[in-house]
Every structure is written in structure tokens, then in C-alpha cells.
From Swiss-Prot:
The keyword Secreted applies. Gene3D superfamilies: Cysteine proteinases. This is Tubulointerstitial nephritis antigen-like. GO terms for biological process: endosomal transport. InterPro entries: Papain-like_cys_pep_sf, Pept_his_AS, Peptidase_C1A, Peptidase_C1A_C, Somatomedin_B_dom. GO terms for cellular component: collagen-containing extracellular matrix; extracellular exosome; extracellular region; extracellular space; lysosome. Transmembrane segments: none annotated. Belongs to the peptidase C1 family. Pfam families: Peptidase_C1. Its main location: secreted.
């Protein structure tokens, strides 16, 4: 390390000019505007001192990273246009800096006062009294490092930044974007309906419900930051099944809000709910269309009460129900109540699920969502190991429910065949493949084949004629 005695200060301008004259021509460093002239100053930073670095004359490698730029600890930096590190004068020359100290912290070319804040994705950074930033260290739902690792890892699917998730922590994603409570042991042990393939019956290698039943399979909705996948997936499957089983005479998009607000027995609305309770309500009480009772979009309201139920019905005989209230949406007059028959559980064999789906329509599936699923952009999803070496708080999962709409196969570059399900999520059309995703089939990936439900829409001849 070189330190300049105070007696040599008068020679410093001359040393700077000599160093400049020794160069052949003028390089980028000479032509660039000085850091401090651009207002890039961090008087509280310890740069030269941290590295014990002071250099004579001009030494372009006597440099350090500095607020997105480069600063120097050599005598040449102290020319008319200065690019010295902020502690150069104090540490190397033993004199006060020629620039007034900043009362605050620098970020993005802007000065923040002490206790001022800015957000770095999901983490809040606060300016401390020592003029240094202190940032939270929460795992973010959108993790650029994880996106990069997945896309470079050849896992068979692509990751990306879903803008609606930017700024959310991973914990918030698990709490607000899922919402299906894992069924009790008694429900998980409910009797399975086994579907038997006929002798010689061969299922197609690819199937999509929207191709067999055009205009009867509804597009995904967006649950927002409401932990209500239990209501959204139930309403989605019931909507398609009622449309299919009525032969297209009834094509409602059923209301998740009707379930969220009115199915309150052991249910928690936007704080989570159970699938068995949702299907009981649809069978015994029924719901109206989403146009009649639209989603209110309440988000992250953990402390407040659930929106009150604004739709009620009465028995008409033979199990049918009739609405006793007008639509919450005053622009809609049709308040018809839609119901289903008792829900049934399918076997976990993928062939049984495929046959049921092809004959009767989309099915509902429980699944475990891991931290990387939120980043899904396209391809055939399987949970990746990219977070295995990180602390446990970066490896989170929760229970979700979705609508399976079809299946297919894809030939990999090495010649292997990869089988997959196609499914509709409830995170809106901007997520994944237009609101849908593909996931590996036949190996119970993320438990998606462990608890699969089907149901029949309650449709009578009077319904067919009425509609």
C-alpha cells in the first residue's frame, strides 16, 4: 500500500498531469464524465480502505466496483474530472473529501433519506444511519436465479417471470395462491370407482376435452391472491360437466364466489377450503353462474370477515333448488341454480382416469405445488431439484386443486416417450400455456393422480327444455 504524506499534496495536480501525459492518446477513462460530476457519491463507503489499496500515478487496475460503475484509488483519479473512490482523499491522502457527504443512501442514482425504503422484488431495503442499505432476506416467489437454473438444466419445461407474482414472497405464494386443504383421512380413504377397459380397448395417445366437446369446456379463471383453489377448481369441473351432460343446452360458467361466500360450514373462503365440502354444497344447495355472482377479488384480507353470502335458495321438490335472491350483479337477471350428483373418486391408475375423462369430461385433481411450479411458462412440468442445496425456507410446498382436461405424449431427443396430462389452473390466462399446464403422467408427479374426482351434472328433461 502507498500512502501520500500531507506535505506532497501540492504536487498531486502535477502528478496527475504527468500520468496523463505518459499515456498514448485518450482512452475511455479520460473521456468518461467523472463519477462525482454525475452525482454518484457514497461518502460513507469504505472502498480503498477495505482493500488497503492506494496507487501512485495512473494504475487502471487500481479500481473497485462502485454503485454499478468503477472507482479508482490511484493519483490519476484526482484530476479535474474525478473518478476516485469516495474514501480516496481520507484514506490515501489524509484530507477531507472535496464533496459534501451525502445525508442518506444512494440507489439507482437517487438519494434516499435515513429510514427511506425501496423494494427489491419481494424484499424491502431500508437506509440505515450509517448510510448503508439493509434489506430483508425473504425468498421471493419469482426467483431469477431459479429461473436461470431451470432453463439451463434441460428439465423439459421452461420457467419465466409471471408478472402478477413479482414482489410476492414464496410464503405469500403458498398462502394466497393455493388454498385447497388436504382432505381428512376418512375422505382420502373413500371408496374408489374402478373403470374397466373393455377387452381390446385401446385409448388414444392424445386427447383434449375441448376437441371432443367444442364450446363446452370453459377457459381458466383467476383466483388472484385468494386462497380459493378449492372453489375455483370445483366450479370449473362442474361447469364443464353440466355443459356436457346437458348436451350443450346449459353452458354456465359457475360462480366460485357463490362457494367462497356461502359454503361456510368448516370452510374458510379465501383462507382455504375442502373439496368434499364444496361438492356437498353444489349437490345440496347449488350455485348460480359467475355472471350472476361474480368474483369479488378480495385479496390478502386475513383479518377481515368473508364477504357475506348474497345468494340463497329454497327446495322445489325432488332435490331441486330455486334462487330466492336477485343476482348480486344487478345487470344480470338469470339466477338459475345449478346442481350436481354425488361426487365419486376415481382410481389412481392413469388408464382409469383417461377413460373417465374421455367418456364423461374433465376431472378434478389434488396436487402438491412446489416453489418451482409458480415459475412454469411452458413444456412438460416435473418438480426440479434446483432448490435442494438451499435453506429449507426456499423449499416450500402446499396443496392445490386443478382441472385435468386431457393427455398426450411427446418424443424426446433421445428417443424416449414422455407422457403427460394437460390441466387448467386458476391463475389466469397469462400464466403457463394460456392458463394451462402439462405435467408428467403415469408416475403420480406431485401427487396429481392420488386423489381424482368426477361428478355428473344434475340435468333433467325439464332443464333441457327450459334452456
Amino acid at each position: 500500500m502507498w500512502r501520500c504524506p500531507l506535505g506532497l499534496l501540492l504536487l498531486l495536480p502535477l502528478a496527475g498531469h504527468l500520468a496523463l501525459g505518459a499515456q498514448q492518446g485518450r482512452g475511455r477513462r479520460e473521456l468518461a464524465p467523472g463519477l462525482h460530476l454525475r452525482g454518484i457519491r457514497d461518502a460513507g463507503g469504505r472502498y480503498c480502505q477495505e482493500q488497503d489499496l492506494c496507487c501512485r500515478g495512473r494504475a487502471d487496475d487500481c479500481a473497485l466496483p462502485y454503485l454499478g460503475a468503477i472507482c479508482y484509488c490511484d493519483l490519476f483519479c484526482n484530476r479535474t474530472v474525478s473518478d476516485c473512490c469516495p474514501d480516496f482523499w481520507d484514506f490515501c491522502l489524509g484530507v477531507p473529501p472535496p464533496f459534501p457527504p451525502i445525508q442518506g443512501c444512494m440507489h439507482g442514482g437517487r438519494i434516499y433519506p435515513v429510514l427511506g425504503t425501496y423494494w427489491d422484488n419481494c424484499n424491502r431495503c431500508t437506509c440505515q444511519e450509517n448510510r448503508q442499505w439493509q434489506c430483508d432476506q425473504e425468498p421471493c416467489l419469482v426467483d431469477p436465479d431459479m429461473i436461470k437454473a431451470i432453463n439451463q438444466g434441460n428439465y423439459g419445461w421452461q420457467a419465466g417471470n409471471h408478472s402478477a407474482f413479482w414482489g410476492m414472497t414464496l410464503d405469500e405464494g403458498i398462502r394466497y395462491r393455493l388454498g385447497t386443504i388436504r382432505p381428512s383421512s376418512s375422505v382420502m380413504n373413500m371408496h374408489e370407482i374402478y373403470t374397466v377397459l373393455n377387452p381390446g380397448e385401446v385409448l388414444p395417445t392424445a386427447f383434449e376435452a375441448s376437441e371432443k366437446w367444442p364450446n363446452l369446456i370453459h377457459e381458466p379463471l383467476d383466483q388472484g391472491n385468494c386462497a380459493g383453489s378449492w372453489a375455483f377448481s370445483t366450479a370449473a369441473v362442474a361447469s364443464d360437466r353440466v355443459s356436457i351432460h346437458s348436451l350443450g343446452h346449459m353452458t354456465p360458467v359457475l360462480s366460485p364466489q357463490n362457494l367462497l361466500s356461502c359454503d361456510t360450514h368448516q370452510q374458510q373462503g379465501c383462507r382455504g377450503g375442502r373439496l368434499d365440502g364444496a361438492w356437498w354444497f353444489l349437490r345440496r344447495r347449488g350455485v348460480v353462474s359467475d355472471h350472476c355472482y361474480p368474483f369479488s377479488g378480495r385479496e390478502r384480507d386475513e383479518a377481515g370477515p368473508a364477504p357475506p353470502c348474497m345468494m340463497h335458495s329454497r327446495a322445489m321438490g325432488r332435490g331441486k333448488r330455486q334462487a330466492t335472491a336477485h343476482c348480486p350483479n344487478s345487470y344480470v337477471n338469470n339466477n338459475d341454480i345449478y346442481q350436481v350428483t354425488p361426487v365419486y373418486r376415481l382410481g389412481s391408475n392413469d388408464k382409469e382416469i383417461m377413460k373417465e375423462l374421455m367418456e364423461n369430461g374433465p376431472v378434478q385433481a389434488l396436487m402438491e405445488v412446489h416453489e418451482d411450479f409458480f415459475l412454469y411458462k411452458g413444456g412438460i412440468y416435473s418438480h426440479t431439484p434446483v432448490s435442494l442445496g438451499r435453506p429449507e425456507r426456499y423449499r416450500r410446498h402446499g396443496t392445490h386443486s386443478v382441472k385435468i382436461t386431457g393427455w398426450g405424449e411427446e418424443t424426446l431427443p433421445d428417443g424416449r416417450t414422455l407422457k403427460y396430462w394437460t390441466a387448467a389452473n386458476s391463475w389466469g390466462p397469462a400464466w403457463g400455456e394460456r392458463g394451462h399446464f402439462r405435467i408428467v403422467r403415469g408416475v403420480n408427479e406431485c401427487d396429481i393422480e392420488s386423489f381424482v374426482l368426477g361428478v355428473w351434472g344434475r340435468v333433467g328433461m325439464e332443464d333441457m327444455g327450459h334452456h
